Regions:
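Residues located in well-ordered beta-strands
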Residues: 2, 16-19, 33, 72-74, ...
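N-terminal glycine-rich beta->alpha transition that marks the start or flank
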Residues: 11, 20-72
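A glycine-/small-residue-rich N-terminal strand-loop-strand element
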Residues: 71-97, 171
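A structural motif shared across PLP-dependent enzymes of the aminotransferase-like
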Residues: 95-109
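A glycine-rich, Thr/Ser-enriched phosphate-binding loop motif common to dinucleotide/cofactor-binding enzymes
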Residues: 117-140, 146, 153-156, 194
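N-terminal Rossmann-fold NAD(P) dinucleotide-binding loop
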Residues: 160-161
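Adenosine-nucleotide cofactor-binding segment
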Residues: 168-209
Length: 209
């Protein structure tokens, strides 16, 4: 299969388009024919070598290696012991170092999310890391109740937009911080009740008004 690998850490100029053997799923794993992949900060730091072992708790993969952690596609192979996934299923996933910069990827079955037919592969691949982060913040961190107020930083970013929508759906009022007027408009379009441009004012004082 075709893949994008790096043989040295650094910028995107170190990407190499190469042929590598097709992966095979082991016990508890699934093979996914990728239709779209996500590109997030985790991928950038992995490529540049700025995600050191002292932060991750695991060694950097040996070079050369295929990077990537998010993807969406169609299940084309099922390993031993997997019973809740079928060939042909449309799925998305996030799993660190799952080598998604390729045509196929092997993923642990429990990491898969089934994609509904009305959700594109592109959306599925792009939403996983940011969506899981937003879901954790919205439902596991603050014990928020309907009518509470939440401050969302970078409200016009990928995680911020998703988090705002989740909070609003739970009846939470949202104050979002942004860096430009255009981002303020976008944050409000996605549900923010009030926005603060932190370049123009001190958000820590504004939220108390």
């Amino acid at each position: 299969m075709k893949a994008v690998q790096i043989s040295r850490f650094g910028g995107p100029e170190h990407f190499e388009f190469v042929d590598v053997p097709d992966p095979s799923p082991g016990p508890g794993e699934v093979l996914v024919d990728l239709r779209a992949i996500g590109v997030n900060y985790r991928d950038v730091t992995s490529r540049s070598g700025e995600f050191p072992p002292e932060l991750t708790g695991k060694p950097m993969p040996p070079l050369p290696y295929v990077t990537g952690s998010e993807g969406a596609g169609i299940v084309s192979g099922i390993g031993e012991g997997v019973s809740d996934v079928r060939l042909g299923d449309r799925v998305a996933f996030h799993e660190n170092d799952s080598r998604t910069y390729a045509e196929k990827a092997v993923v642990r079955a429990w990491r898969l999310v089934t994609l509904p037919d009305n959700l594109s592969f592109e959306t599925g691949a792009a939403i996983m890391l940011q969506g899981l982060t937003a879901e954790f913040l919205a439902h596991d961190c603050g014990n928020l109740k309907p009518g509470d107020i939440a401050l969302v930083h970078s409200a016009a970013g990928g995680t911020g937009l998703l988090l705002t929508q989740m909070l609003k759906r739970s009846g939470i009022r949202v104050i979002g911080t942004v860096s430009t007027d255009n981002k303020a408009v976008l944050a409000k379009e996605f549900g923010a009740d009030y926005t603060i441009n932190y370049r123009d004012s001190d958000f820590s004082q504004e939220v108390l008004r």
